From Swiss-Prot:
Native species: Geobacter sulfurreducens (strain ATCC 51573 / DSM 12127 / PCA)
Activity regulation summary: Allosterically activated by GTP, when glutamine is the substrate; GTP has no effect on the reaction when ammonia is the substrate. The allosteric effector GTP functions by stabilizing the protein conformation that binds the tetrahedral intermediate(s) formed during glutamine hydrolysis. Inhibited by the product CTP, via allosteric rather than competitive inhibition.
Protein name: CTP synthase
Binding site for L-glutamine: G354, L382, G383, M384, Q385, E405, R462
Active-site residue numbers: C381, H507, E509
Domain (Glutamine amidotransferase type-1): residue spans on this chain: 292-534
GO molecular function, one term: ATP binding
Gene that this sequence comes from: pyrG
Amino acid sequence: MKTKFIFVTGGVVSSIGKGLASASLGALLESRGLRVTMQKLDPYINVDPGTMSPFQHGEVFVTDDGAETDLDLGHYERYTSARLSKRSNFTTGQVYFSVIEKERRGDYLGGTVQVIPHITDEIKHKILENAKGADVAIVEVGGTVGDIESLPFLEAIRQFKADRGAGNVLYIHVTLVPHIKTAGELKTKPTQHSVKELREIGIQPDILICRCEMELPRDMKAKIALFCNVEEKAVITSTDAEHIYAVPLALHKEGLDEQVVEKLNIWTKAPDLSPWHSVVEKLRSPLRGEVRIAIVGKYVNLTESYKSLSEALTHGGIANDCRVVLTYLDSERIESEGIGSSFDDIDAILVPGGFGERGTEGKIKAIEYARTQKIPFFGICLGMQMAVVEYARNVCGLEDACSSEFRPDCANPVISLMEEQRDIDRLGGTMRLGAYPCSLTKGTFAQKAYGSLEISERHRHRYEYNNAFRETLVANGLVVSGLYKEGDLVEIVEVADHPWFLGCQFHPEFKSKPLNPHPLFRAFIAAALDRKDKRR
């Protein structure tokens, strides 16, 4: 089958839910037996989000091949079986970088390099490269229609219909239908203007996904269809769902996937959505109650910074048939005010990744509390590193132990810069990134969770466990349960004399899915449930 292309744009406001809509559509099409690939086009000039502040951009999602990408790719991987790569996310910066490189090589034979056709051709080339081998390629265009940054991308996808044929290209526009409480009415005018602006560019949307607080009445759907030149059945209501994993079911009920396959003339089997129904039922009515997990971090005022993490914890709850309630605690506040009653109602503690010294002493206090009070603990990336520092200080007696990231001249740098990072003077794309193999020690928390001795996980770091201190730490009871053998790099540490205490250098949250929860999150939530049951 010739690859079909679905382009998803957004209008009226940003953060309207294009990523979730795209991911949900991917899940629906996969349930019909189609091979789906996903892609995000980001209009910002940064080459990638790797050096952007979490407060501005939210989470950086890492793929197996080491791409630092937009957090929407996390949605795509969680909702579909698509294995995403560096080709799955590109920015204005990457496009212009490629075109300028070609111009310097002389690829354009002295011609004047312009937005049309050179920039738009490069965008189309990158879309086509990612779509190889797929039945359907879903491409989300970041930003909002009307943004000046988005214009080259919109022009490129406009050209796709002429290039690939009208029957092989579909445009979906996600828009807002606000409810004006003082008037008690839903207003369609913002949607009309957004579609008008899109049509001025040359794109006629085939389907509208209308984000609103309540179901759109039939007469309002008819009005939107009339003014926006779409079929009434192609006006899809999308209200806020009880759980984000209910969105595919809600969009299916509205007929989104039926409209897509009909308009693209694709014959498919009937959708099998039973796995999604099972997930939603477990979220709605868990048999084992709830557990409370504390996330001790420095970006807690913007929880989008921990998007994959919070979702992976939810997946752990699905696997254990319980609801996971998250409490975000500011590590700086713990650093200045102490533990106090922060963990009185908590069943487990998690310290996530991050960069920089700010708030790290608060994380160390939380880790010490988890270790000494026998509370299940999970440390990820920086969280694992701070667990090593805490153990070195409070168990091994190395009082000035620290990471050389924060104190380059400390006497006991139990966490140090990786050897291959020492001569690097550029920040962008230079960390240890992507999937690496890890060998597990039999009988440890990690090995029992995975049920295997060999695993592969995704990384994003520059600093590592300092092997110069391994003998001392191991002699005092800190178990090395996971090792990257090729570089003799410690990947996982544990405290054996503890209900469940594990720190890992990698980011397991990037590989967790609602239909396939990650083994470590499954085990962590199980340990939290066990503690909760014993405290009754």
